Regions:
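A short acidic, Gly/Pro-enriched loop at the edge of an enzyme's catalytic core
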Residues: 121-133
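A generic alpha-to-beta junction signature in SAM-dependent methyltransferases
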Residues: 57-59, 82-83, 156
Length: 236
């Protein structure tokens, strides 16, 4: 029985390894077909985009960081190994993604990363507990985007940083068509989506003037700082 359990665990590990490699090939453009997909459909370099997003967080960051959705941690693993003074929580709704990320955490020895399955629309955390929230290519997949934005704002400390990127409509007709005909039908994307202008307006309405945005093909890259609470007369 012990041998059977070990064999089953090995098969499961090998299965997740194959899934991780295929998924990562698609995202990173390691294969010719994935490079065609990223260039022809999206007209973007996901590796460059990921580097630009992660550069918004310093390697010497100290504090608690929430990564939602963590995905397979393909783009963040190397960064997190350098962030030795950070306490990082990776959350994803998909148990498969969590399993793949756990395999990467183990094989690449990312000691400061903990992984949890959960819903961004109902984050299982107290108010104002994170110093930074990272969300890379997540919002197009969130069914309840308003709740996701509100929950991230709730768990972020005043003065904390919210950064990442997500798909915006109206920038590239081929990408918009692919989203509607393929990604939505497969359940990978969930409407509605903001235009770039709408995304910028939304972020400014929540975070005020301390908002930076950049358009990269059909993606909005952003960095926001949550305003400090205004002190009351009793606190002064």
């Amino acid at each position: 029985n012990i041998l059977d359990k070990k064999m089953m665990a090995n098969r499961q590990s090998n299965s997740y390894q194959r899934m991780m490699e295929h998924y990562d090939d698609l995202l990173t453009g390691r294969k010719w077909w994935s490079r065609i997909y990223m260039r022809f459909i999206w007209n973007e370099d996901t590796n460059l985009l990921a580097r630009k997003v992660l550069d918004l967080i310093p390697d010497d960051f100290r504090g608690r960081l929430l990564d939602v959705p963590v995905g397979t941690a393909i783009f963040t693993a190397e960064k997190y190994r350098r962030m030795k003074d950070a306490e990082i929580v990776g959350l994803d709704y998909s148990e498969e993604m969590i399993a793949i990320a756990a395999l990467r955490k183990e094989t690449e020895e990312i000691a400061n990363l903990s992984l949890e399955q959960g819903d961004v629309g109902e984050l299982p955390y107290a108010n104002e507990i994170f110093d930074c929230v990272l969300s890379m290519n997540g919002f197009q997949a969130f069914p309840e985007k308003e709740k996701a934005f509100a929950e991230i704002f709730r768990v972020l400390k005043p003065g904390g940083c919210f950064c990442g990127c997500f798909y915006v409509k109206g920038e590239r007709r081929l990408a918009d068509l692919f989203v509607k005909k393929v990604m939505e039908r497969k359940g990978f994307f969930h409407p509605p989506y903001d235009t770039f202008a709408e995304a910028e307006s939304r972020l400014r309405s929540m975070y005020g003037d301390d908002v930076l945005t950049e358009k990269m093909a059909s993606v909005c890259l952003f960095r926001c700082v949550k305003p400090q609470r205004e002190s009351t007369e009793n606190e002064q």
